[in-house]
């Protein structure tokens, strides 16, 4: 309780426990009198990855996606300097996926998340672009240099195309 959370930038590589641990973090910050809008950091908060590559999920997919979207919506509104989710495809290659499969699953996960957020009645059309901009990615860069380089270039182009074409 002596670490001034409002002056820190905290990265939490947590997924299934993201809602619970972020709540504890916020409670400590509140006890310190910190302004939630000043809190900076990231929660990985990628429960889909837990199903696809690690098997460390706690809840079934639908409730897991609900928790993820709850965190994204809450932090975007209450903690504007917080990065609420980091789609993590890194572990997919570690679990045997090819670079193409890794990229495909990362984009599919992000699309599922954004579709879930957009479907929520409390998220306005005006607020949605801010939520889109809060998603980040953690991708692998394996030993196949040229393949990985091409993957990264394709990823940027595809994500731009998806966000503009699908979400405006």
Where are the model-predicted features located?
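Catalytic alpha/beta active-site cores
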Residues: 1-148
């Amino acid at each position: 309780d002596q670490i001034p959370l409002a002056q820190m930038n905290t990265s939490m590589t947590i997924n299934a426990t993201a809602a619970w641990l972020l709540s504890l973090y916020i409670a400590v910050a509140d006890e310190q009198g910190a302004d939630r809008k000043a809190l900076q950091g990231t929660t990985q908060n990628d429960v889909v990855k837990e199903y696809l590559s690690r098997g460390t999920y706690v809840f079934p997919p639908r409730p897991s996606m609900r928790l993820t979207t709850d965190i994204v919506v809450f932090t975007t509104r209450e903690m504007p300097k917080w990065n609420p989710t980091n789609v993590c495809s890194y572990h997919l290659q570690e679990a045997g996926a090819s670079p193409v499969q890794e990229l495909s699953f990362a984009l599919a996960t992000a699309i599922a998340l954004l579709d879930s957020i957009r479907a929520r009645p409390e998220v306005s059309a005006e607020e949605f672009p801010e939520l889109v901009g809060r998603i980040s990615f953690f991708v692998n860069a394996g030993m196949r240099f040229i393949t990985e380089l091409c993957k990264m270039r394709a990823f940027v182009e595809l994500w731009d195309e998806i966000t503009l074409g699908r979400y405006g």
